[in-house]
Amino acid sequence: MIPDLDIFRSANVLVKQHGQDAPIHAAMRADAMLEKGDLEGQVVWKRIVRAVEEIQRTDRPSGEVLQ
């Protein structure tokens, strides 16, 4: 299993490259993995999608820290 830190690093790169479209790009990669039959790859990209969404989330309570 890929560590969460690596997932968030990948998500951060996508956000820097694609901005607000980063979740779409990650979801497209997840779909491509599924089409290839690479279920493990799809799981990784779904984790990246969630990490991108977390990075881009703006409604953080005061004091909440992004891990």
Task: Annotate the PLM regions.
Residues 1-13, 67:
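Short, charge-rich, low-complexity alpha-helical interaction segments
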Residues 12-57:
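Amphipathic, hydrophobic secondary-structure cores in small proteins
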Residues 54-67:
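Short, charged, intrinsically disordered terminal tails
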